């Protein structure tokens, strides 16, 4: 048991766990506020057309896999989280711990979001079967316009959890590359 306790504290220090929980809470609170105050597919221009807040629902997994299928998407996300925890446990000295923590926060934030039906103007309820006027899927709301050389005129909307994963992976890639060069 002592090995487990030491290993757990090496990998998941209290500060790191706090960062993970902070990321999850920030993600879920922002999603709740957007559900409460926005109508689906209506937008609020924050910085003109460059940055808008638009309530959308992503019913798939990575790159739209399992679109409109809540249970397979939930299972795939759960498997990804178990893989991340196991990989981090085995390779706890690989990469930057802050990068790992951000990836975990984002993965858990979107995973938890998949357990709820969204009711615009009201909030959430636990479940996977929406009634009329209700939605399933992960709440996305950060909507940016990028230069026209991209294949689409607007970048797909995303959320705080997606941002945590992207920033965390960027940190991990750079730190692992630096470790490799040493």
From Swiss-Prot:
- Residues annotated as transmembrane: 15-35, 44-64, 65-85, 97-117, 155-175
Organism whose genome encodes this protein: Leptospira borgpetersenii serovar Hardjo-bovis (strain JB197)
Q: Pathway listed for it?
A: Protein modification; lipoprotein biosynthesis (signal peptide cleavage)
EC number assigned by the record: 3.4.23.36
* Disulfide topology: none
Topology of the protein relative to the lipid bilayer:
Multi-pass membrane protein
Q: Where in the cell is it found?
A: Cell inner membrane
Q: What class of enzyme is it?
A: hydrolase
Assign the protein's first listed, main location to one coarse class.
Answer: membrane
Provide the protein name. Answer: Lipoprotein signal peptidase
Against InterPro entries, the record matches this protein to:
Peptidase_A8 (IPR001872)
Whether Hydrolase counts among this entry's keywords is yes
Q: What does UniProt give as GO cellular component?
A: plasma membrane
Biological process annotations from GO: proteolysis
Per its UniProt entry, which superkingdom is the organism in?
Bacteria
Q: What does this protein do?
A: This protein specifically catalyzes the removal of signal peptides from prolipoproteins.
Family that this chain belongs to: Belongs to the peptidase A8 family.
GO terms for MF:
aspartic-type endopeptidase activity
Active site residues of this protein? 140, 162
- Which reaction is the catalytic activity of this chain? Release of signal peptides from bacterial membrane prolipoproteins. Hydrolyzes -Xaa-Yaa-Zaa-|-(S,diacylglyceryl)Cys-, in which Xaa is hydrophobic (preferably Leu), and Yaa (Ala or Ser) and Zaa (Gly or Ala) have small, neutral side chains
State the UniProt keywords alphabetically. Aspartyl protease, Cell inner membrane, Cell membrane, Hydrolase, Membrane, Protease, Transmembrane, Transmembrane helix
